């Protein structure tokens, strides 16, 4: 499958959305819901969503691979957010106006500091060479994940910079009905965005690992193509999510020909997530580390995921939930 678009900005919904004054099922303590109407959005139509590649929206945290210190590095998402005074002004403005775009930001003074190594996301809007905050008042960006990072320990667990590899979950190249966990050179993932999923991410919707033996992987965006999708109509998509085995996913992301990404989340359709039994957990999974350790001058840490998976290389499991590593 060819490389698809990367997530460098907030994705719009495929439908026009409306806000309802009901408690959110997605965010605790949020007193409103954002629901899809039956009208396709102008952005979706302009991007020719009818001819886009539909893929599974995977529930994790967004990451990015690009160079740092002269080699490919994994980067964690870090949005630059307004300081207390600016946030107060922004929220007051939103109550009196309809569009966040009319608000005037001072990017030098209105935002909390970020590490020097922080970089803004690629596709965000810029004015006079400076990044413009999105409709939430945030500037999406990235920070490199250093080896042994405590703040980003789960990110760090899926990469090894000495070996230059990442632990990746995707379809088996010879059998789309089988998942594969493999060690992939970071150089092959350059300029891609991926989703970090696992035990300690977003409440672990896929039931991976355990507190005693946490388990995490990177999944490239667009890795799981959705086939046999119904027509782009609200009720047809609703029925597909509710009734089809393939519909037991968080949502759909359409990768459009112009690089635009369009999404729909189960919550947009008033449906629940997470689910007790996900489509991702309905497929067998095989371990293919394919590492010739004789080619390296260093060895894996005994506790690392790479070492643990090397011990069960070539084994096959009925589903992801069944993988339990020795501690």
UniProtKB/Swiss-Prot annotation:
It comes from the Eukaryota. Its EC number is 6.5.1.3. The keyword Disulfide bond does not apply. Functions as an RNA ligase, in vitro. The ligation reaction entails three nucleotidyl transfer steps. In the first step, the RNA ligase reacts with ATP in the absence of nucleic acid to form a covalent ligase-AMP intermediate and release pyrophosphate. In step 2, the ligase-AMP binds to the nucleic acid and transfers the adenylate to the 5'-PO4 terminus to form an adenylylated intermediate. In step 3, the RNA ligase directs the attack of the 3'-OH on the 5'-phosphoanhydride linkage, resulting in a repaired 3'-5' phosphodiester and release of AMP. Keywords: ATP-binding, Ligase, Nucleotide-binding, RNA repair. GO terms for molecular function: ATP binding; RNA ligase (ATP) activity. Its cofactor is Mg(2+); Mn(2+). The gene is Rlig1. AMPylates itself (auto-AMPylation). One of its GO terms (biological process) is hematopoietic progenitor cell differentiation. This is RNA ligase 1. It is an enzyme of class 6 (ligase).
